[in-house]
Amino acid sequence: MKKAYLTVVSNREIADHIYEMTLKGDLVDSFQTAGQFLHIKVSESMTPLLRRPISIANIHAEKQEATIIYRAEGEGTKLLSQKRDGESIDVLGPLGNGYDPSVVQSGQTALLVGGGIGVPPLYELSKRLTKKGVIVKHVLGFQSKKDVFYEEKFQALGDTFIATVDGTYGAKGFVTNVIEENDLSFDVMLSCGPTPMLKALKDSYPDKPVYISMEERMGCGIGACFACVCHTDQHEKAYVKVCLDGPVFKAEEVALSC
């Protein structure tokens, strides 16, 4: 983990209020694991005070560039969406424990399931798994057609299924409906998205290895403030820190309350 300034290469809207930002700098050399995140200071002023945690969607190591994808909905991310090419951004990272690629072997099938803004980290993961010979399938869930992004990029790596809650694109319903209706088989599931989605996946496949990346509000991003604790399934008084111990966990390790 290091603190550094990265330069904005591009920052564009790719879906409704969804932005893709490419950053460049020496810090990218330390981005080695899919599923980690950056803690970004969105303004040089005192407000907003807290950094914003945003997952890494794509790493271009040879260019020292990395891409993040975020939803501009709050004060901080709206400020981030106004950043222009050439500006510098104060970044702390990479943070957290990402996905362990060794949990799925060459020739096996990995089912990657993402919901909304939980989709981005799965792209870098899919790239890495495909490179090692894993058969990758994707199920991506969104609220509506206007929210869909990166479909073609995922499709280039493996079979990709889209679900929208309102049925305006792809299958109508949730990611769990798509998995069941298409009878998608897999050896390992790796997912990222809202807690209700993660809980549904955990409950639906208790006998399968399911890995989840949790979305939690964070304060410090380094485990000091206890803002993102989550109880474990082993003991009601035991907990983990999502920013430090996660955000990726084996589903059976954490208690998911919706």
Curated annotation (Swiss-Prot):
Cofactor note: Binds 1 [2Fe-2S] cluster per subunit. Binds 1 FAD per subunit.
Transmembrane as UniProt keyword: no
GO MF annotation list: 2 iron, 2 sulfur cluster binding; electron transfer activity; flavin adenine dinucleotide binding; metal ion binding; oxidoreductase activity
Keywords: 2Fe-2S, Electron transport, FAD, Flavoprotein, Iron, Iron-sulfur, Metal-binding, Pyrimidine biosynthesis, Transport
Chain residues that bind [2Fe-2S] cluster: C220, C225, C228, C243
Obligatory cofactor(s): [2Fe-2S] cluster; FAD
GO terms of biological process kind: 'de novo' UMP biosynthetic process
Keyword Electron transport found: yes
Superkingdom classification of source: Bacteria
InterPro entries found in the cross-reference section: Cyt_c3_hydrogenase_gsu (IPR012165), Dihydroorotate_DH_ele_sf (IPR037117), Dihydroorotate_DH_Fe-S-bd (IPR019480), Dihydroorotate_DHASE_ETsu (IPR023455), FAD-bd_FR_type (IPR017927), FNR_nucleotide-bd (IPR039261), PyrK_electron_transfer (IPR050353), Riboflavin_synthase-like_b-brl (IPR017938)
Pathway membership, UniProt: Pyrimidine metabolism; UMP biosynthesis via de novo pathway; orotate from (S)-dihydroorotate (NAD(+) route): step 1/1
Residues the entry annotates as binding FAD: R52, P53, I54, S55, I69, Y70, R71, G76, T77
Boundaries of every FAD-binding FR-type domain copy: 1-101
Pfam family of the protein (one): DHODB_Fe-S_bind
Role summary: Responsible for channeling the electrons from the oxidation of dihydroorotate from the FMN redox center in the PyrD type B subunit to the ultimate electron acceptor NAD(+).
Subunit structure: Heterotetramer of 2 PyrK and 2 PyrD type B subunits.
Family per similarity comment: Belongs to the PyrK family.
NCBIfam families reported in the protein's UniProt record: PRK00054.1-2, PRK00054.1-4
Name listed for the protein in its UniProt record: Dihydroorotate dehydrogenase B (NAD(+)), electron transfer subunit
